Amino acid sequence: WERAPLLKGKTILVTGSASGIGLETARLCTAMGAKVLGVDVTKRFDHVEEFYRADLTDGATIDALIDVLPKGIDGIANIAGLPPTAPADKVLAVNLFGLKHLTLGLLPKLNDGASIVNLASLAGFGWSDAIPAILASEGVHVDDATRFAAEHQITNAGGRSYFFSKEALIAWTMQNRWTWRDRG
């Protein structure tokens, strides 16, 4: 990275930091001068300053993560995600419900002016066609992903669990884009 370190002195939390887009995001943030707090269910990645192992399908694990993470976070990069080949309830838990649980729990630990980036996909482009299920998903706890998937017949057929997780994430992100703006 040849530019000035744009993130120098910033603390960025990156979920999914051990592989794929999360790994590359952590590397880029580190190269840009950030202190990276990596979160993943698997292994530690060398380009993070601190690593936290957490399973984003489990509410108690997420709560424990929130408890141990430091205050003073300048950004959250919600990158962790499962593909449509994973069980539908796990896809919903990681890609949507766990992400929301973690993000909302971390709000008191964010610095004023902090940024939140939620990685979605073109798979979520049809979110407006899924509004009834999206509205039904609003208060669902991460530990209730299996029940929600069954009640709303969200399965892996045609990648539906993945598509829905991204549709609902886009809607939630748009819904909350102004929610915390008074913090800068």
Predicted regions and their residues:
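Hydrophobic positions on the long internal alpha-helix
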Residues: 102-110, 172-173
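N-terminal Rossmann NAD(P)H-binding glycine-rich loop of SDR-like oxidoreductase domains
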Residues: 18-27
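Rossmann-fold scaffold of SDR-type NAD(P)-dependent oxidoreductases
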Residues: 15-16, 73-81, 113-121
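Catalytic loop of short-chain dehydrogenase/reductase
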Residues: 83-84, 89, 115-184
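NAD(P)H cofactor-binding loop motif with strongest signal on the N-terminal glycine-rich segment
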Residues: 10, 17, 168
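Conserved glycine-rich Rossmann-like NAD(P)H-binding loop of the short-chain dehydrogenase/reductase
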Residues: 31-46
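Rossmann-fold cofactor-recognition segment
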Residues: 46-60
